[in-house]
Amino acid sequence: MILKYILPMLTLSSAAAGYSKGEKLLMEKKALLYEGKAKQIYAAEDERYFIMTYKDEATAFDGAKKGIIEDKGIINNRISCLLFKMLEEAGIKTHLVKQLDERNVLVKRMKMVPVEVVIRNVTAGSLATKLGIEEGLTLPMPIIELYYKNDDLHDPMINEYHAAAMGWANWEEIKEIQAIGLKINEILKRFFDDIGIILVDFKLEFGICDGQILLGDEISPDSCRLWDKQSLEKLDKDRFRRDLGGEAEAYREVVSRIEKNLSK
């Protein structure tokens, strides 16, 4: 059964109350630079940073299906910030600076690598469909897939040679990104296992800041397939994709388990 978890509501004004004048300036949104399916990116007062805002909109099948998941932006912001902090403590460099309020997070400005990294631990989704195999088979080793980020082309699958030849990243950067991805996978698999969740697969994005490769974007039920270990109930955006219902409750269940584990 999915447990209802009520997030504490934090407004921008209440969040700003504890900040210095300089820190409050960092929280001021300037020009909207980019709007995607689930987030908006704003310029910040300090040009070294962006402000990333999470939305409640949900999309699937390249935007063909659209809807709203109640408080999704709030929940995903919280989950992603908690997981990024945990990864930072484990030695993974990320774009996270600080969570500003319930929907907004301050991140480092960086040049994004236009390649999505998908890591799979269990057969599901397009992997099962393309290869004609059943869902739910535990893989003997993780599978890494690369996709060129291009909405018009529907994010085609590529390999390291495509990325290097097209100049999206050099060979060394791609290899480092893959190595970081595998390390993140090991950390997250153990963490989710401890809270009774199977990390089926997930998507990562990276960028380059001051010559360093940083983990960017988010890690949330929007970008991961998460199944309850006992019931195999889906706790991610597949509930929206497949019209299963209970999306908000599933997302709340994930953040509840994460917070309880990290508060020990």
Which ranges hold each PLM region?
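Classical Sec-dependent N-terminal signal peptides that target proteins to the secretory pathway
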Residues: 7-17
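Conserved metal-phosphate-binding beta-hairpin within the catalytic cores
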Residues: 119, 199-217
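A short glycine-rich, hydrophobically flanked beta-strand micro-motif that places a catalytic Asp/Glu
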Residues: 98-103, 193-207
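C-terminal helix-cap and adjacent tail motif
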Residues: 137, 219-264
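Short histidine-centered catalytic/ligand-binding loop motif
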Residues: 64-74, 157-180
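A long amphipathic alpha-helix within ATP-dependent nucleotide-binding catalytic cores
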Residues: 168-200
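Active-site loop/lid in soluble adenylation, ligation, and acyl-transfer enzymes
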Residues: 28-147, 258, 262
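Short, Lys/Arg-enriched N-terminal segments with co-localized hydrophobic residues
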Residues: 6, 19-26
